[in-house]
A protein has these predicted regions:
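Helical element adjacent to the flavin cofactor pocket in flavoenzyme catalytic cores
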Residues: 206-251, 255-258
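Mid-domain catalytic core of redox enzymes
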Residues: 247-365
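Rossmann-like flavin
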Residues: 93-200
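Active-site-adjacent "gating/activation" loops or surface patches in catalytic cores
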Residues: 185, 189-214, 218, 456-457
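N-terminal glycine-rich phosphate/pyrophosphate-binding loop and immediately adjacent elements
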Residues: 3-133
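A conserved FAD-binding loop/helix module that cradles the flavin
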Residues: 464-486
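C-terminal segments that line or cap access tunnels to active or ligand-binding sites in enzymes
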Residues: 315-424
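A glycine-rich dinucleotide-binding beta-alpha-beta segment and adjacent secondary-structure elements
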Residues: 179-193, 352, 406-468
């Protein structure tokens, strides 16, 4: 039997790292705080309805394929490409915009508001393509042992991209497009990083390339939780045990080595190597008691937005509503600048709606739909009181009904609401921040919490708040980077 590994947390990065380790001869055990694995990539079942609780689509499918090849398995889930990627609706217009990967089809919708949209979009995406290919292998998919190493890596990036470092996402988009509609829709992807186009670095315009040209977006057959279910099946075949309802609260270690973690009941969990898949910053503070990651120090870091999520089962079909939909207001700039810190933005919220049952009939009873709403909101520093959750949720649901021309309120069969309070409690997210640490320039690469521990040589980290960052493909990459660290130790 190989060296033993304890993985704390059964999020996507934890599951992926565990499988890599098991396939390379390690004896792996996973402990998970919650009642089922998956972390934020989870599932809610209620009254005959099934909901994805977190991510509702994914990109960079080749990272998942490479992971499966590395582990010597077939990809343990099936997926389909989204076309259109999603729709966008503005409150001051009845028009629905369809975001297609086919640039000609996309451009046809902009003829009246953005002359030469196709040519502009191709120039913009070509720049995004060059940023992506000049940075992803050098910066995103590498471990760094020091700031010096990180600096050397950055020096390998084509210097033509240097001006990008001094622009925001919206500023880069505005260099190519003049209409409000084009600017807003092209920059919408910045919200996927948990911030806004006005405070996200222009470096991340590379995401436009990943969505429109490089790979696109995908839905998992049966729902996104199928990724977790597939990995759990493979872990079971590999002899990996998952123990749920086990929250780690303390540790024991000496002479630069971690000896055991302790759970809330006092039981110790020992191993040769340890991997923490909780938030890398929060875990260091709450479990490892590191002063550099105290609540006060964490508050000084930059975090992603909080999220209000609504899981709604209704007694009617919505044939004219797409799988993925964004509903925006007519005050995009003002809203985006205020949404992180001003609770008043919830009076006219922007939100996303996923109709999971659109292509997964089993996720809702016959004649019904399963709807998943996501609304960006201030985190608990700026809105600690969520006693108005019901009022806010119903205002969003009512607005959605008006936008689609169908009052769905009388058809509600089940409704579940998660606020940043629930996200903080269930997943140990700082102040209810939905995606962990933000991706500002001084919080990426070697500036991000390391994926190896500062004190214990046999403790490592994987997940959103360590390298490379948030998102499902990033979790797969994070698992591999942690795996490389761990296998180099022994």
């Amino acid at each position: 039997m190989g060296k033993s590994v304890l993985v704390v947390g059964a999020g996507l990065a934890g599951l992926a790292a565990a499988l890599r380790l098991a396939k390379n001869g390690y004896s792996v055990h996973i402990v998970e705080k919650n009642s089922q694995p998956g972390g934020r990539l989870n599932q809610l079942k209620k009254e005959g309805f099934t909901f994805d609780t977190g991510p509702s689509f994914f990109s960079m499918s080749y990272e998942f394929k490479q992971f499966a090849r590395d582990c010597g398995i077939d990809l343990p889930f099936r997926y389909v490409e989204l076309d259109p990627l999603y729709t966008v609706n503005f409150s001051n217009s009845p028009k629905t915009w369809y975001l297609y990967k086919d640039i000609k089809k996309l451009a046809a919708q902009f003829e009246e508001v953005e002359p030469d949209f196709e040519e502009k979009m191709r120039r913009y995406l070509d720049k995004c393509r060059r940023i992506f290919h000049d940075t992803v292998d050098i910066v995103i998919k590498q471990n760094f042992n020091s700031l010096f190493d990180f600096g050397l890596a950055l020096m390998r990036v084509n210097p033509v991209h240097l001006p990008i470092l001094f622009r925001k996402f919206n500023q880069q988009v505005n260099r190519y497009f003049v209409s409000a509609e084009a600017r807003r829709m092209v920059s919408l992807v910045a919200f996927f990083l948990g911030r806004t186009p006005f405070d996200t670095s222009a470096v991340y315009t590379l995401l436009s390339y990943t969505e429109f040209m490089h790979d696109g977006y995908y839905n998992v057959e049966g729902g996104m939780y199928g990724i977790v279910e597939g990995l759990v099946r493979e872990l079971d075949k590999a002899g990996v045990k998952i123990t749920c309802n086990t929250e780690i609260t303390g540790f024991r270690g000496a002479n630069g080595r971690l000896e055991a973690f302790t759970d809330r009941s006092g039981q110790e969990w020992s191993a040769d190597l340890f991997l923490a898949n909780g938030d890398a910053a929060v875990f260091r503070g709450s479990v490892m008691n590191r002063m550099a990651f105290s609540p006060e120090k964490l508050d000084r870091m930059e975090w992603t937005m909080g999220y209000l999520t609504i899981y709604l089962g209704i007694r009617r079909k919505l044939p004219h509503v797409n799988h993925h939909n964004y509903f925006l207001g007519d005050n995009f700039e003002a809203y985006a600048r205020d949404v992180r810190i001003n609770p008043d933005t919830l009076q006219k919220p922007y939100y996303y709606v996923n109709v999971i049952s659109k292509y997964n009939d089993h996720c809702a009873p016959e004649g019904c739909e399963s709807l998943f709403f996501v609304c960006p909101v201030p985190d608990l520093r700026y809105k600690p009181d969520w006693s108005d959750r019901e009022e806010i949720a119903m205002s969003i649901i009512s607005d959605f009904g008006k936008r689609i021309g169908q009052d769905i309120v009388p058809d509600i069969l089940t409704k579940t609401i998660y606020t940043p309070l629930e996200w903080k409690e269930q997943f140990n997210l700082h102040r209810g921040s939905g995606l962990g640490l933000s991706h500002k320039i001084m919080q990426i690469g070697a500036f991000r919490p390391k994926n190896y521990d500062e004190e214990f040589k046999n403790l490592f980290y994987a997940g959103a708040s360590t390298i490379p960052g948030a998102g499902l493909p990033m979790a797969i990459i994070s698992a591999n980077l942690a795996f490389e660290r761990m296998t180099a130790v022994l």
